[in-house]
Amino acid sequence: MRKIILASGSPRRKELLELAGVPFEIIVSEVEETIGAYSSPSDIVMSLALQKASAVAENNSDHIVLGADTIVTYESRILGKPSNKAEAKEMLQLLSGKTHEVYTGVAIIAKDKTVTFYERTEVTFWELTEEEIDAYVASKEPLDKAGSYGIQGKGSIFVQHIQGDYYSVVGLPISRLVRELKQFNIDVTHA
């Protein structure tokens, strides 16, 4: 039987697959995440997801491999994972009181088929005080997250409004993924 392999070390993606009852194994993709010249954020996340999944699929061609990537954008600026606390603070100041977009791209690769898709979610932050930002950055939570916040953690208190898929902001649009897996004869809704 074909296994599902998650090409990611993200604890959030792992948790979402577990919550949905998707059986899987993890093989972390060692692909260097580089953003080339793309026309849109959706192209970027789908391309990076495909690169990650492809790298793992090379040695696991008998299985189904999932890759995913998430970016945050504000006014055409891409906000990836901050490289340090100062950059995290700068990103949070930029997002304070404003609406930004979160894009998560997913690639599903099997021997006979490849599917890519993305979800776009709008997130609006409350106005943040410097003290709130400093305390959050000091917690180190934002340092491994696109846009410098985790909506499922302490960063949730910054969110005034969300339009779209919450789980996509966490890192994996699990409802859409489960539906797309049906194309690969994987149905976890009856498990």
UniProtKB/Swiss-Prot annotation:
Protein's cellular compartments: Cytoplasm
Q: Which cofactor does it need?
A: a divalent metal cation
Question: Which Gene Ontology terms describe the biological processes this protein takes part in?
Answer: nucleotide metabolic process
GO molecular function terms listed in the Swiss-Prot or TrEMBL record: dTTP diphosphatase activity; UTP diphosphatase activity
Active site (record annotation): 69 (proton acceptor)
Which keywords, in A-to-Z order, does the entry hold?
Cytoplasm, Hydrolase, Nucleotide metabolism
Q: Looking at the record's lineage, which domain of life comes first?
A: Bacteria
- EC id: 3.6.1.9
A Pfam entry, by short name: Maf
Please list the reactions this protein catalyses. dTTP + H2O = dTMP + diphosphate + H(+); UTP + H2O = UMP + diphosphate + H(+)
Instruction: Give the protein family.
Output: Belongs to the Maf family. YhdE subfamily.
Q: Which NCBIfam families does the UniProt entry name for this protein?
A: maf
Q: What is this protein called?
A: dTTP/UTP pyrophosphatase
Q: Which organism is it from?
A: Bacillus anthracis
Source taxonomy: Bacteria, Bacillati, Bacillota, Bacilli, Bacillales
